[in-house]
UniProtKB/Swiss-Prot annotation:
Induction: Induced by RpoS in stationary phase. CDD domains: TM_PBP2. This is Probable D,D-dipeptide transport system permease protein DdpB. Residues 33-104, 157-199, 270-279, 323-340 are cytoplasmic. One of its GO terms (biological process) is dipeptide transport. GO terms for molecular function: dipeptide transmembrane transporter activity. It comes from Escherichia coli (strain K12). Belongs to the binding-protein-dependent transport system permease family. OppBC subfamily. The keyword GTP-binding does not apply. Part of the ABC transporter complex DdpABCDF, which is probably involved in D,D-dipeptide transport. Probably responsible for the translocation of the substrate across the membrane.
Amino acid sequence: MTFWSILRQRCWGLVLVVAGVCVITFIISHLIPGDPARLLAGDRASDAIVENIRQQLGLDQPLYVQFYRYVSDLFHGDLGTSIRTGRPVLEELRIFFPATLELAFGALLLALLIGIPLGILSAVWRNRWLDHLVRIMAITGISTPAFWLGLGVIVLFYGHLQILPGGGRLDDWLDPPTHVTGFYLLDALLEGNGEVFFNALQHLILPALTLAFVHLGIVARQIRSAMLEQLSEDYIRTARASGLPGWYIVLCYALPNALIPSITVLGLALGDLLYGAVLTETVFAWPGMGAWVVTSIQALDFPAVMGFAVVVSFAYVLVNLVVDLLYLWIDPRIGRGGGE
């Protein structure tokens, strides 16, 4: 298979996944008990007012008509209008998405900076105390609820030690940096505001660490497995026989080859972090898409919920597409193997 045929195949898969998410999200959102028009009008509103709001929102029409209108607007780049705020969903996502993306990138960076060295050491010291510790860490990370871990680190680092802030993106007395990218760290650097940069960095540490903990152990175990496979290859034995230092063999020979199969796991981790940010943002009062969609669900804001699902699923599939193409570029044998 050629590069373009694989790209075409993956793009079709992207379209099918996003279409499936649209259908499933639409069905589930309309199965949730409750009346958005009643919530918007208030408990004391008359039935006539509620019915008028329902007509304005198009909720009085059959479901297939509502779905057709939604898909038609989606093809024109319109995710609808939020029932709760009255603003376009796309406009609200542009406000909240950068905060979620900054948190996800921060968590991924922490997972890589800690997980890769742990995986290397775990492979080099196989079946020793560090190897067992990494295994326990991976199991604990997968089984620990994010909200429980988040509350725990807030109590420890903010409540008892008082060395890190417990929520938000900035202290209340600081003004956000001028909006350029929506990433406070990057915008503060572009503005040359060191005070805002370090304050935003302090606020990012706890939620990013909480979100990264689940994937930290997974990254470490993946690197360990790939490193063990590489360390048993003949070229490693040849390098050792030639008298090269052990650390040089591990870092310059085994590690680059071990990172190739790990690219897929790292790409999937970024997609998972976008979904996993929902609970983490709620716990840390992080003003991103997670906290926004939780409020939208409570208000039965169907357009906002469906817009969130479409954007996040599209980002998830797009990340996988980039990972597949990157993997193909690094190792062209995959494309040749797919065509045989």
